């Protein structure tokens, strides 16, 4: 069975394992999520389910979203995301899925979120380029470096790493261990850091590349 969940990043803390070793963890408010649509090959060309998460005032929704929730007869939700599944018929419309139904301690997950915005950044911060010499007479400290050849090709190649906006990108961190699942409070503790700021939306899925 596929494992997936939507959540909200709360922050980081630390816990101790049975051997007394300290483990840095991210606390995630995970679910519950509600199934709002099923997609099948006959109608959409592929199998998936769309799920909703997070309470929101109805006035914050657009007309298609209002219509979707009104048709289902459920409270409006802030986020709607789609997950690929093998068989959508295993899920029912308006079905509520809780975190303990999907994940247990010891599972490994991939967590996707939107990274923190860093504003306009140079190539050293943005891409980790080496800096230039700080010696007397050097005018090259934090600059870009070579921009290409001269007369030919007479242009800067596409993909050249240059200063620009950093962050606010979709980032996935793979193979994180699930340390604890708190069913009563809908909390999930994941070892290590996950993308995004506090309160940011996270997509949590069963890992696709298991560690050897």
From Swiss-Prot:
InterPro entries, per database record: Ribosomal_uL3, Ribosomal_uL3_bac/org-type, Ribosomal_uL3_CS, Transl_B-barrel_sf
Pfam families noted in UniProt: Ribosomal_L3
Ribonucleoprotein in keyword set: yes
Keywords annotated in UniProt: Ribonucleoprotein, Ribosomal protein, RNA-binding, rRNA-binding
Signal peptide: none
UniProt record, GO biological process: translation
Gene Ontology CC: cytosolic large ribosomal subunit
One GO MF term: rRNA binding
NCBIfam families assigned to the protein according to its UniProt record, in alphabetical order: L3_bact
Subunit structure as annotated in this protein's UniProt entry: Part of the 50S ribosomal subunit. Forms a cluster with proteins L14 and L19.
Function: One of the primary rRNA binding proteins, it binds directly near the 3'-end of the 23S rRNA, where it nucleates assembly of the 50S subunit.
The name this protein goes by in its record: Large ribosomal subunit protein uL3
Native source organism of the sequence: Acetivibrio thermocellus (strain ATCC 27405 / DSM 1237 / JCM 9322 / NBRC 103400 / NCIMB 10682 / NRRL B-4536 / VPI 7372) (Clostridium thermocellum)
Record lineage: Bacteria, Bacillati, Bacillota, Clostridia, Eubacteriales
């Amino acid at each position: 069975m596929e494992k997936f969940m939507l959540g909200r990043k709360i922050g980081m803390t630390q816990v101790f394992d049975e051997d007394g070793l300290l483990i840095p963890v991210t606390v995630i408010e995970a679910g519950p999520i509600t199934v709002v649509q099923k997609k099948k090959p006959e109608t959409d060309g592929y199998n998936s389910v769309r799920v909703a998460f997070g309470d929101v005032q109805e006035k914050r929704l657009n007309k298609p979203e209002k219509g979707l929730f009104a048709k289902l007869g459920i409270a409006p939700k802030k986020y709607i995301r789609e997950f690929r599944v093998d068989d959508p018929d295993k899920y029912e419309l308006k079905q509520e899925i809780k975190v303990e139904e999907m994940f247990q301690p010891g599972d490994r997950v991939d967590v996707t979120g939107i990274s923190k915005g860093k504003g306009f950044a140079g190539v050293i911060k943005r891409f980790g380029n080496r800096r230039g010499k700080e010696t007397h007479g050097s005018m090259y400290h934090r600059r870009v470096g070579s921009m290409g050849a001269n007369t030919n090709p007479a242009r800067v190649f596409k993909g050249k790493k240059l200063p620009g906006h950093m962050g606010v990108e979709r980032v996935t961190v793979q193979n994180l261990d699930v340390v604890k699942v708190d069913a009563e409070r809908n909390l999930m503790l994941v070892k290590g850091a996950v993308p995004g700021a506090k309160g940011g939306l996270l997509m949590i899925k069963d890992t696709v590349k298991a560690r050897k």
